C-alpha cells in the first residue's frame, strides 16, 4: 500500500496500536453497513481497511482515548 503513507498516518494518531484499532473498527463498520458509504469523496482503495486509513489521514475520523 502506497497511500496513505505510514508517516502521514502517524502524524494523525499517537501510536501504531491506536492506528490499528481505529482503522480496524472503522473497516468493520464499512463492511457491515452497506448503506453508509465512506467519508472520503472518492477513495483510492477498494478494501475497507484502505478506505479507513484514507479517512484517518484526511481527518474524517476522530477517536477518544478512555482514561484507565
UniProtKB/Swiss-Prot annotation:
Domain of life assignment: Bacteria
Organism: Halalkalibacterium halodurans (strain ATCC BAA-125 / DSM 18197 / FERM 7344 / JCM 9153 / C-125)
Quaternary structure (record): The RNAP catalytic core consists of 2 alpha, 1 beta, 1 beta' and 1 omega subunit. When a sigma factor is associated with the core the holoenzyme is formed, which can initiate transcription.
GO cellular component entries: DNA-directed RNA polymerase complex
Protein name as catalogued: DNA-directed RNA polymerase subunit omega
EC number: 2.7.7.6
A biological process from GO: DNA-templated transcription
Similarity-based family: Belongs to the RNA polymerase subunit omega family.
Function: Promotes RNA polymerase assembly. Latches the N- and C-terminal regions of the beta' subunit thereby facilitating its interaction with the beta and alpha subunits.
Gene Ontology molecular function, alphabetical: DNA binding; DNA-directed RNA polymerase activity
